[in-house]
Amino acid sequence: TPMVLLREPEGRRRLLPILIGTAEATAIHTSLEGLEPPRPLTHDLMAILLGEFGASLARIVITEVRDHTFYAELHLVATDTDGADGDEPDHVISCRPSDAIALAVRVGAPIFAAEDLVDECGQEAAVVSDDDDAEEIIDEFRDFIENVSPEDFAP
């Protein structure tokens, strides 16, 4: 099962692992690699529709986990007539984290996770120094990925 690992940009630098579907993983990977399909895929279409209707994605927020399922929100703002985006979202739409991330990487929107969610489900990232053996670090990470399950992150 594919997994997205979100990392805190500063501070403790915890990881938030989220299991996602293969189609969504492919959509995220395609966008991150800068690959453009000959015709728009679902998340490309969503990005186009936002622009056509004068809205932009201000940010996404991974908000909570319930019964081993993560939830997210799209924070949309209407583009002002002068082209500036407002600070507060005009619309907040609930969605799957994988769809939110796939859309965010397409439009360059920031990705956030609720602090209490990271406190609850986040995993401490290993501290890597120049002295650490890269092979050992990779083996530990592979072991983590191969053995992780949704129950590991449930409250």
How does the language model describe each region?
Residues T1-P155:
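Divalent-cation
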